[in-house]
Amino acid sequence: MGVPSELNHEDASAASAPLNRTDLFWSWQSGYKHLRMDVAPEGGVLKPDNSTTTTWNIHLGSTGCVGSAQTGETVNCSADNRPIIELDVSDIANQQIVIDYGKLVENSSLLNDQGGAPGCMSGPTDLDCPDIFDALGMGLGENSDPTPGQTVFSVETL
């Protein structure tokens, strides 16, 4: 899951499909979102300052990036944030890969944001991210220990 490092920092407006999707590009990190899931809970999301917003988002992407591919520099990111998902798919014609959103957010409150941008934007200090990253079997930030095993993806027989 995610965009390979060598393609992650191309110019989205000049890229070929599917990398031409600018809604999946993070201008502030000059790279693509590896996963984007946005929900609009009924009643909105309460922020710490008691204001509300309409969506709670999960945007998984590389962070801590330096360098500019547009100027020919090599881009290096301190946290690639690409989960490794291994599944046993033995009969692709009769099986499908399933993403369980409920498992992804089961320890998160979609009605209450803990600060910053609503939901998890992959930041190492974003309080809404640790449980999301745990569900994906990843560590959060550049020096974190990953949680063994992901709980979000599975294989089902058709």
Task: Label each residue range with its predicted role.
Residues 1-158:
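A short, solvent-exposed, low-complexity linear motif enriched for acidic/polar residues
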